[in-house]
């Protein structure tokens, strides 16, 4: 049990509502702006007298800058303070979003998107690290579930809302609203900083340790194995999810509408991470991860055959979303608790592993889908997820006692 968990024993009854709201809203804003580009592409192409394929590069630019932003800005949290890293990310996000809203040519729009991607790369992993720093151990799964569910909420509500605003008013208003949301998150974090400073002054002075290096972070027990599990889970997920819509369009006559409705069922399941995270807090995070990865492995192999029954397809998509959100919540929570000193850098590796899986999952499974169909994609993605499951069994046997001791201490 680390010192962070010792502190949690004294504060376990205090749910950090303000902090949870700030982090959830920040990730929601970042996720919404990342995803809202797709429905706005025709309007953007018309505004800048360009082609949709050219404007689509703004999505790639955003992704590349996430890779740069995470290792560049997140270590500020380890060296100085998490708030500094969060505020730096938010200020860059606001500036980038305002540039997008004001852009009169495609160059400045791409510049704004690049800054927004840089900001997301800094804010999201730092938000995960802050949960490990500030949230009592008994509430970590619940708060991490809130943050994870904000990605799903961005897809279900943020993107349609942004698209609606762009259609009714103007696409520029979409970015103005996201910028205002960023300002609101800044105010919430400043309030949280003030509250934390008062609490810190009333307690004992904390001893600062050197921040360490990325290599030091990889030497922390549990980190390499759970980063690998993250990669296995994410590449299996994105490889399967990338072609789900295309497969459903081929199976059903409703085209995009039918496929969109089925994918929404997955999103509803994913948004349940607040509930599943709370349950995982009670039965144990590492044990819950075993169950989630086992269920996902079976689902991925069977999903291509689910359309034979409408009930089976709906149930499979909902359970897949439920288990995937639980897995993401658990992995981010477990990794954030591995090391207080290296927490920021650990979450950088988590973010990089997830984003690398996004790229490789669709790229590697594309040729497989074209040549052999969705069933082959399902078997390969299931096999990769099984590898993550096997690693999680190994990790539970080797490190499970650490979590059990922490839970026993917190229950006393």
Swiss-Prot record:
- List locations, semicolon-separated: Cell membrane
Q: Which Pfam families match?
A: MFS_1
This protein's superkingdom?
Answer: Bacteria
**One GO MF term attached to the UniProt entry:** transmembrane transporter activity
A cellular component annotation (GO) from this entry:
plasma membrane
Q: Which InterPro entries does the protein's record reference?
A: MFS (IPR011701), MFS_dom (IPR020846), MFS_Efflux_Transporters (IPR050189), MFS_trans_sf (IPR036259)
PROSITE patterns reported in the protein's UniProt record: MFS (PS50850)
UniProt-listed GO biological process terms: transmembrane transport
UniProt keyword annotations, A-Z = Cell membrane, Membrane, Transmembrane, Transmembrane helix, Transport
> Which coarse location class describes where this protein primarily resides?
membrane
Q: Which residues cross the membrane?
A: 17-37, 54-74, 91-111, 112-132, 146-166, 173-193, 225-245, 257-277, 299-319, 346-366, 375-395
Query: How is this protein situated with respect to the membrane?
Result: Multi-pass membrane protein
**PANTHER family, A to Z:** CHLORAMPHENICOL EFFLUX PUMP RV0191 (PTHR43124:SF3), PURINE EFFLUX PUMP PBUE (PTHR43124)
Family classification: Belongs to the major facilitator superfamily.
Name of the protein: Uncharacterized MFS-type transporter YwfA
Organism whose genome encodes this protein: Bacillus subtilis (strain 168)
């Amino acid at each position: 049990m680390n010192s962070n968990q010792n502190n949690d024993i004294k504060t376990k009854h205090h749910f950090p509502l303000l902090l949870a709201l700030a982090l959830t809203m920040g990730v929601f804003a970042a996720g919404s702006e990342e995803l809202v580009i797709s429905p706005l592409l025709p309007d953007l192409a018309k505004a800048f007298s360009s082609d949709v394929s050219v404007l689509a590069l703004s999505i790639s630019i955003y992704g590349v800058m996430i890779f740069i932003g995470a290792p560049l800005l997140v270590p500020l949290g380890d060296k100085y303070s998490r708030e500094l890293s969060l505020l730096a990310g938010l200020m860059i996000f606001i500036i980038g979003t305002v540039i997008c809203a004001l852009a009169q040519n495609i160059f400045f729009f791409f510049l704004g998107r690049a800054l927004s991607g840089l900001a997301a790369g800094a804010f999201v992993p730092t938000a995960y690290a802050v949960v490990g720093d500030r949230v009592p151990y008994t509430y970590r799964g619940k708060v991490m579930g809130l943050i994870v569910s904000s990605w799903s909420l961005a897809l279900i509500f943020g993107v349609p809302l942004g698209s609606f605003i762009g259609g009714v008013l103007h696409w520029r208003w979409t970015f103005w609203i996201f910028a205002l949301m960023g300002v609101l998150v800044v105010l919430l974090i400043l309030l949280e900083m003030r509250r934390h400073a008062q609490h810190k002054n009333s307690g004992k002075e904390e001893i600062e340790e050197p921040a360490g290096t990325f290599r030091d972070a990889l030497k922390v027990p549990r980190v390499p194995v759970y980063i690998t599990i993250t990669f296995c889970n994410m590449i299996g997920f994105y490889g399967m999810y990338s072609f789900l819509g295309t497969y459903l369009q081929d199976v059903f006559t409703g085209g995009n509408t039918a496929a969109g409705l089925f994918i929404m069922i997955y999103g509803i399941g994913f948004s349940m991470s607040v509930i599943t995270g709370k349950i995982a807090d009670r039965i144990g995070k590492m044990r819950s991860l075993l169950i989630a990865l086992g269920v996902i492995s079976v689902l991925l192999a069977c999903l291509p055959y689910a359309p034979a029954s409408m009930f089976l397809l709906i149930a499979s998509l909902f359970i897949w979303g439920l288990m995937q959100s639980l897995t993401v919540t658990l992995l981010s929570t477990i990794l954030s608790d591995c090391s207080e000193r290296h927490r920021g850098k650990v979450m950088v590796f988590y973010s990089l592993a997830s984003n690398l899986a996004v790229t490789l999952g669709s790229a590697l499974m594309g040729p497989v889908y074209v040549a052999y169909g969705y069933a082959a994609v399902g078997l390969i993605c299931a096999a990769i997820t099984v590898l993550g499951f096997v690693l999680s069994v190994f990790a539970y046997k080797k490190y499970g006692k650490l979590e059990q001791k922490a839970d026993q201490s917190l229950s006393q």
